[in-house]
């Protein structure tokens, strides 16, 4: 499957991230059963990453690249685009499909 992007609320429809730009996002990560494993919103601190530098999982690289500034979307990410057979011990089980609620706040 890779990554499926479903818009929760639209962005400006014009400003899309490009490789090398810093994406500033708020997110909540959940397992398929709805169990939350991480949230920048809970920390009240947006998360930043540089698109194309492999600082995040492949599902984020490809999913966030399809979003425009201001957009909030549900990213459903298959294990091969997330943490695969290894998972993330103690947090994400092996072969887990992940669901992220991501809002692209701005680009830097």
From Swiss-Prot:
Q: InterPro entries per the record?
A: FKBP-type_PPIase, PPIase_dom_sf, PPIase_FKBP_dom
Gene3D superfamilies linked: 3.10.50.40
Q: For this UniProt entry, what's an example GO CC term?
A: Z disc
Q: Where is the PPIase FKBP-type domain?
A: 20-108
Modified residues annotated as N6-acetyllysine in this record: 53
Which reaction does this enzyme catalyse, per its entry? [protein]-peptidylproline (omega=180) = [protein]-peptidylproline (omega=0)
Q: Molecular function (GO) terms listed?
A: activin binding; calcium channel inhibitor activity; FK506 binding; peptidyl-prolyl cis-trans isomerase activity; protein homodimerization activity; SMAD binding; transmembrane transporter binding
Indicate where this protein resides in the cell: Cytoplasm, Cytosol; Sarcoplasmic reticulum membrane
Q: Does the keyword Lyase apply?
A: no
* Entry EC no(s): 5.2.1.8
Q: What is this protein called?
A: Peptidyl-prolyl cis-trans isomerase FKBP1A
- Look up and give the organism this protein is from: Bos taurus (Bovine)
């Amino acid at each position: 499957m890779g990554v499926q992007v479903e818009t929760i609320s639209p962005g400006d429809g014009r400003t899309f991230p490009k490789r090398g730009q810093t994406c500033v996002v708020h997110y909540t990560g959940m397992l398929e059963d709805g169990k939350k494993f991480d949230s920048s919103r809970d920390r009240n601190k947006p998360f930043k990453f540089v698109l194309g530098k492999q600082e995040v999982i492949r599902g984020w690289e490809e999913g966030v690249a399809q979003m425009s500034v201001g957009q909030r979307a549900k990213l459903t990410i298959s294990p091969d685009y997330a943490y695969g057979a290894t998972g993330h011990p103690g947090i994400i089980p092996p072969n887990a499909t992940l669901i992220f609620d991501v809002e692209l706040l701005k680009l830097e």
